[in-house]
Curated annotation (Swiss-Prot):
It is an enzyme of class 2 (transferase). The gene is proB. ATP binds at residues 14, 173-174. Keywords: Amino-acid biosynthesis, ATP-binding, Cytoplasm, Kinase, Nucleotide-binding, Proline biosynthesis, Transferase. GO terms for molecular function: ATP binding; glutamate 5-kinase activity; RNA binding. Catalyzes the transfer of a phosphate group to glutamate to form L-glutamate 5-phosphate. One of its GO terms (biological process) is L-proline biosynthetic process. SMART domains: PUA. Residues 280-357 form the PUA domain. It comes from the Bacteria. GO terms for cellular component: cytosol. This is Glutamate 5-kinase. The keyword Translocase does not apply. Pathway: Amino-acid biosynthesis; L-proline biosynthesis; L-glutamate 5-semialdehyde from L-glutamate: step 1/2.
Length: 371
């Protein structure tokens, strides 16, 4: 099973607050530089890495001289605003020493729930990866309340895995992995090497909340692994304090706990599209486009003869032949109004007709399910 991690091409690495801030003592430049070194080595092997980093609130608390995490929402948000500045600066310096550029992306759950914003975020992240940039993602704690109060970056890491169709989510924490019981209370607890992410017994094994510095505990990591598995991504929970955990995992070494998914990211995505989409309209296609869809290719504007219904970018639409038979369904890259302006036209005309081009196809093949 460890070959699943060894063969992964796109990975999400989530680093917890306790690691980033050395248990609340302040940002730990040496630790950040070490992760940057490992990620640079993985990039050199052809891996694509997205970093999800906690630590803004904890770093802000240290800068403001606060010992205890406050309960008032406005004070948490103030700490996040102060800490995010130092967090991004420290990461930028660390990665630049290893020849890598970084990009800051602050997300909320609303960004990933709204289809248009979801597609925009996905396009940006995929482009950054293609450019060789390391995206550094954090929750936008300054403007979001529910995420600070109830949320955690373990969940965000799983959502980002879905967003970019990652193969693997690696959660680095201050524990070696998942144990059969809380090792701080039960000396007989043993480390679980691997298992199915959807196995419900792991929730019972996970302990309570984390430290006063971090928000989540092991239970949030298990639930994040379950969420990632539904996107087809495997999850490894490992200690960020061990030597070279990322490189050792990439070499197939049995580090931490591997919770594996039952399907690939693309299979999971296709299943989700088939089961959950509510159609907002239809695209009527000609015979050539119908053959292309049957062959598993993307739908281009030139093959569309009619647009039915009113919908926004990111909506689910049916692809039908000229007799009305549904051939496929998927997520459309342009609104109904935009589709009407570019139908029957080659992709090269999109920018001239609209003044911009979001994507070269109306529906990408990865966002299509053949009926």
């Amino acid at each position: 099973m460890r070959d699943k991690i060894k063969n992964a091409r796109r990975l999400i690495v989530k680093v917890g607050s306790a690691l980033v801030t050395n248990n609340g003592a302040g940002l730990d430049p040496a630790a950040l530089d070490d992760w940057a070194r490992q990620i640079a080595a993985l990039r050199a092997r052809g891996r694509e890495i997205v970093l999800v980093s906690s630590g803004a609130i904890a770093a802000g608390m240290q800068r403001l001289g606060w010992v205890k995490r406050p309960h008032e929402m406005h004070r948490l948000q103030a700490a996040a605003a102060v800490g995010q500045m130092g967090l991004v600066e420290a990461y930028e310096k660390a990665f630049s020493r290893h020849g890598l550029q970084t990009a800051q992306i602050l997300l909320t759950h609303e960004d990933l729930a709204d289809r248009t914003r979801y597609l925009n975020a996905r396009s940006t992240l995929v482009t950054l990866l293609e450019l060789g940039v390391v995206p550094i993602i954090n929750e936008n704690d300054t403007v979001v309340t529910d995420e600070i109060k109830f949320g955690d970056n373990d969940t965000l890491g799983a959502l980002v895995a879905n967003l970019v169709e990652a193969d693997t989510l690696i959660i680095l924490t201050d524990q070696r992995g998942l144990y059969t019981a809380d090792p701080r209370r039960d000396p007989g607890a043993t480390l679980i090497s691997e298992g199915r992410a959807e196995d419900r017994q792991y929730e019972a094994m996970a302990g309570g909340a984390g430290s006063g510095i971090s928000k989540g505990g092991m239970i949030t990591k298990i639930r994040a692994a379950q969420r990632a598995a539904r996107s087809g991504a495997h999850t490894c929970i490992a200690s960020g304090r061990e030597t070279d955990p990322l490189l050792r995992l990439a070499d197939g070494e049995a580090v931490g706990t591997l919770l594996y998914a039952d399907s690939t990211p693309l299979q999971a995505r296709k299943q989700w599209l088939a089961d959950h989409l509510q159609l907002a309209g239809s695209l009527i296609v000609d015979a050539g486009a119908a053959r292309a869809l049957d062959d598993g290719r993307s739908l281009l504007p030139v093959g569309v003869v009619e647009v039915q219904g009113e919908f926004k970018r990111g909506a689910a639409v049916a692809c039908r032949d000229e007799h009305g038979t549904e051939l496929a369904r998927g997520l459309v890259n342009y609104s109904s109004a935009e589709c009407r302006r570019i139908l029957r036209r080659p992709t090269s005309d999109i920018e001239q007709l609209l003044g911009y081009i979001d994507e070269p196809e109306l529906i990408h093949r990865d966002n299509l399910v053949i009926r």
